[in-house]
């Protein structure tokens, strides 16, 4: 345990304050714009102390990547020091992707913003370093998408959604474009930069659950599994 959250500091979005035995510091992650000079201070959370691991068992290369010579453990979490002295985890270094233009985007941040689109229930943003913008794979909100198609079905190539095969609906280019446009409208309203706007979207006809392997037991995205499953569709549509 490196941080604890006493009751008087408890609030959504914070992981608390360091325990007495632990030193903590934020280190600049220059490329993504996380600096200790930001207001509030931001950067990679680094920990040191007797309760912090010294390294990986019989894996010196991993240890060298994660632990500095003077004992700081580089967590890979991007943290923020709040005015009340608590810390919040706002990102993960591994979820920051450098695009072709050299700028980084934060996948989880984009997902949290775009989830408010009324036509989806889940989303995984994916970015290729050779692309100028990200793309997304989404699970549709079926009742809302069906309602849209009852209104605009003829225009979108689904004149009778009740008789249409749902897999075909999800693969329909015009339906995908309609969902993409709404996602980007949500993103624009939230202030996303042009390079953070989605280039394309794929619609999964299947719900993502821990049982089918697309989510962890904690409802986190299994990014590698989802990407592997949609590998051919991604190659065909992106970048």
Short names for language-model regions:
Residues 1-12, 28-32, 59-62, 142:
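Active-site loops of AMP-binding adenylate-forming
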Residues 1-6, 17-23, 105, 131-132:
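Conserved A3 ("GATE") glycine/threonine-rich loop of ANL adenylate-forming enzymes
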Residues 12-18, 70:
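Short Gly/Pro-enriched turn/cap motifs at secondary-structure boundaries
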Residues 24, 85, 114, 136:
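Residue-level signal for inorganic ion chemistry
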Residues 33-40, 44-99:
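Conserved ATP-binding/catalytic segment of the ANL
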Residues 52, 86-115, 145-173, 193-195, ...:
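Adenylate-forming
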Residues 78, 117-144, 187:
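C-terminal boundary motif of the adenylate-forming
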Residues 97, 122-124, 180, 184-239:
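Conserved C-terminal "lid"/linker of ANL adenylate-forming enzymes
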């Amino acid at each position: 345990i490196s941080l604890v959250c006493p009751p008087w500091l408890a609030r959504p979005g914070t992981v608390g304050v360091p325990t007495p035995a632990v030193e903590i510091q934020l280190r600049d992650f220059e490329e993504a714009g996380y600096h200790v000079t930001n207001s509030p201070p931001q950067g990679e959370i680094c920990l040191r102390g007797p309760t912090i691991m010294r390294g990986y068992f019989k894996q010196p290369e991993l240890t060298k990547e994660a632990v500095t010579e003077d004992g700081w453990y580089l967590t890979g979490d991007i943290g923020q020091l709040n005015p009340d002295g608590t810390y919040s985890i706002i990102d993960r270094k591994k979820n920051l992707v450098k695009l072709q233009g050299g700028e980084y985007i934060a996948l989880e941040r984009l997902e949290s913003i775009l989830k408010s689109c009324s036509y989806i229930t889940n989303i995984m943003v994916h970015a290729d370093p050779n692309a100028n913008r990200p793309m997304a794979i989404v699970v549709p909100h079926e009742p809302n998408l069906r309602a849209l198609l009852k209104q605009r079905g003829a225009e979108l190539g689904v004149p009778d959604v009740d008789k249409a095969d749902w897999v075909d609906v999800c693969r329909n280019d015009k339906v995908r474009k309609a969902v993409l446009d709404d996602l980007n409208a949500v993103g624009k309203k939230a202030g996303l930069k042009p390079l953070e706007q989605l280039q394309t979207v794929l619609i999964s006809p299947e719900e993502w659950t821990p049982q089918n392997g697309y989510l962890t037991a904690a409802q986190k995205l299994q990014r590698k599994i989802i990407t592997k499953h949609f590998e051919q569709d991604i190659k065909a549509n992106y970048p």
